[in-house]
Each structure stands twice: as structure tokens, then as C-alpha cells.
Amino acid sequence: MDNRTKALNLVPMVVEQTSRGERAYDIYSRLLKERLIFLVGPIDDHMANVVVAQLLFLESENPEKDINIYINSPGGVVTAGMAIYDTMQYIKPNVSTTCIGQAASMGALLLAAGEAGKRYALPNSRVMIHQPLGGYQGQATDIDIHAREILTLRSRLNEVLAKHTGQSLETIARDTERDNFKSAFEAQAYGLVDQVLERRPDESIQAG
């Protein structure tokens, strides 16, 4: 049994009483009803497809009500992350983001991409920004092609981070040269999040 299968087997079930009797949900499906999406783990094409589908579904359910994404991710594939990013910007509902644990690399970009004023981090979470990673091997001409693609992606990611943080392109380029780790409060000062939440506000005790 691989780690993914083990993780799926550990997902709790929630049982609700309805007029037709009991109905069981896995915890993530139940929270999706409250417009909560969990972006947890490495960002790959499968995760991107699932998150994009959830965003589009919630938009169809109510295009005027906020969607909340909780992020605990080490990052992952740039194109997969940008699929989520583009969908967040495309749909009508405001998308709030909250970092729990860590938001690194593409996870940090998606955290910053939440609706302005609705981007949060919990106090002990960590945020890390850096440039896209290379490592392609092959013929020299192919390596050159991939190197140019990485530079193109880096330029675009820097533009996105600058847009959402308010930092200059020069600052973003300098600060992403190497892995750049930040505490929740440092991420707030940098413009990656708007507020560090130590407790849920009293008026929003219910899920969502």
C-alpha cells in the first residue's frame, strides 16, 4: 500500500441526519459544501484538475459567495499551479486563501493570489518563495530550449508576485534568487498575506 492510498484510507467520514435518513460524507466533501477547498501536498496536474473542478463547481452553485482555499503545500509543477491561479482569477466569486503549515514555491504564489484583503496565514505557518527549478537533461539544443522556457516562466512568476504583493519586479527578482523563507508575520510585511490569524473571528465560528 503506497502513501497516497494510506492517506486516503485515513480521511474521516462525517455522518449527517437528513429527512431521508443518514448520509455519510468524507470530511473534504462535507467542507466543500461550506465552500472550503483544501490544497494540501505537492501541486501536480491531478491536484490542479481537482482544485479547478471544485472552484468551477462552487462558482456554478453561487457566483456571489466567497470561496476559501486552505493551503499546506511544498509547491510543485509550475504549469499545474498556474492552472489553479488562472481559474482563481477567472471565476466570479472572491477567493480567500489561508496558509496552514507551509506555502512554498507555487503554494506561496497561490496564497498571494487570493482576493486582496482576504489572504491569511496562521501564526506558525511558513512561506517560501524562489525561482523555478531546472534540472533538464538531454541534448545541448534541448537543454537550451528548456533553459529559455525556465527564464520565461521565471519572468512571468515574478510579474504575478509583484502584482499581488506590491513589491517591485527588481525586488521580487532579487528575493527569489535563492530559497527565501518567511514567517507568517514576515509574509504579511512582504505583502504575501494581509493578516495573521491567531483565532477565528467571533462572527465566523461556522465553517466557511
From Swiss-Prot:
Disulphide linkage map: none
Function: Cleaves peptides in various proteins in a process that requires ATP hydrolysis. Has a chymotrypsin-like activity. Plays a major role in the degradation of misfolded proteins.
Pfam families: CLP_protease
Source species: Stenotrophomonas maltophilia (strain K279a)
InterPro entries for the chain: ClpP, ClpP/crotonase-like_dom_sf, ClpP/TepA, ClpP_His_AS, ClpP_Ser_AS
Lineage: superkingdom: Bacteria
Catalytic residue positions: S105, H130
Spans traversing the lipid bilayer: none
Keywords recorded for this protein, A-Z: Cytoplasm, Hydrolase, Protease, Serine protease
GO CC terms of this entry: cytoplasm; endopeptidase Clp complex
Family: Belongs to the peptidase S14 family.
Ranges in coiled-coil conformation: none
Location within or outside the cell: Cytoplasm
Gene Ontology molecular function, alphabetical: ATP-dependent peptidase activity; ATPase binding; serine-type endopeptidase activity
Gene: clpP
Subunit (UniProt): Fourteen ClpP subunits assemble into 2 heptameric rings which stack back to back to give a disk-like structure with a central cavity, resembling the structure of eukaryotic proteasomes.
Entry EC number(s): 3.4.21.92
GO BP annotations listed: protein quality control for misfolded or incompletely synthesized proteins
Protein's name according to its UniProt entry: ATP-dependent Clp protease proteolytic subunit
Catalytic reactions of this protein: Hydrolysis of proteins to small peptides in the presence of ATP and magnesium. alpha-casein is the usual test substrate. In the absence of ATP, only oligopeptides shorter than five residues are hydrolyzed (such as succinyl-Leu-Tyr-|-NHMec, and Leu-Tyr-Leu-|-Tyr-Trp, in which cleavage of the -Tyr-|-Leu- and -Tyr-|-Trp bonds also occurs)
Database matches in CDD domains: S14_ClpP_2
